[in-house]
């Protein structure tokens, strides 16, 4: 049985998680004590702040920096890192081009952060469309 961490902010400098590579490596050392086999790196995506293609480039760069540092520090027992995103709900999400690129690598799973205000019928309709039509 694999132990999977489905949600982490370990990638350095991309969101409110690991501020830099040193904090990312410190987080990884802590994770290693928990015997995690697979880890989803899921930085925040805010449609009002970033375009999907811009976000994907930043995420890939952060992952590359992280992997390089892990190798440079010769860390052992590193979990497999899968790229994903924590997508803040936005109006029109069900019609957003390239939304699939934000899913967990190798899956159709999308980590969706719902609004912190009462949900409207329109919010629920968007999620339903996202599930059924994508």
Segments and roles (model prediction):
Residues 1-78, 129:
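An N-terminally biased module of ancient metal coordination in phosphate/nucleic-acid-related enzymes
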Residues 52-134:
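Extended substrate/RNA-proximal surfaces in nucleic-acid metabolism proteins
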């Amino acid at each position: 049985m694999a132990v999977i961490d489905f949600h982490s902010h370990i990638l350095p400098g991309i969101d409110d998680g690991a501020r830099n590579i040193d904090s990312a490596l410190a987080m990884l050392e802590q994770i290693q004590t928990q015997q995690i086999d697979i880890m989803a790196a899921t930085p925040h995506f805010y449609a009002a702040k970033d375009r999907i293609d811009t976000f994907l480039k930043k995420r890939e760069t952060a992952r590359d920096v992280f992997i390089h540092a892990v190798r440079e520090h010769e860390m052992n027992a590193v979990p497999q890192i899968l790229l994903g995103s924590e997508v803040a709900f936005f109006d029109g999400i069900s019609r957003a081009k390239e939304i699939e690129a934000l899913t967990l690598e190798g899956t159709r799973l999308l980590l969706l952060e719902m609004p912190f205000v009462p949900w409207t019928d329109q919010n629920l309709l968007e999620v339903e469309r996202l599930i059924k039509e994508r």
